[in-house]
Amino acid sequence: MKAFLLVAALAMLFVLGPVLAMRPSPRQGQLARLRARAVAAGLRVRVEGGRNPGRVADYVLPWRLDDLQQVRGLRLVLRRGDDGAWEDAESLAAPAGILREVCEAVPAGVSALRSIDEGLAAQWNEKGRDEDVERIRDAL
């Protein structure tokens, strides 16, 4: 009888072990929440491949069809330096006052703002609160 219970317990461990291992970690759950909230807010999330722990994701506000003529050829690249100050990486076509407001509105984890073919992108480390997604959307 003891041997049967031992075998049954071992079998349960073999069944439950992989199931418990498939549960997402708290960080993975947070990322899923942030990305779902971004999609619901009208943003697209682009994550580069790889398992680099310092990676960032692009939160992209897509161009609207009526914007396409005005923004074709727009090149905007702003990077946040190590000291937290924004640096102009290329010549800017937008008025400086608007850019200053945008730079102040984004969360601290945003390391770059740029225009890409899909729309305006904020490069974010995704370390923040759920409300930061709306701050990014509103700033873009």
Language model regions located:
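Short amphipathic alpha-helical surface micro-motifs
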Residues: 26-27, 39-43, 102-106
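N-terminal signal-anchor transmembrane alpha helix of single-pass membrane proteins
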Residues: 1-37
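Structured extramembrane domains adjacent to transmembrane segments
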Residues: 52-135, 139
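Membrane-cytosol interface motif
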Residues: 35-49
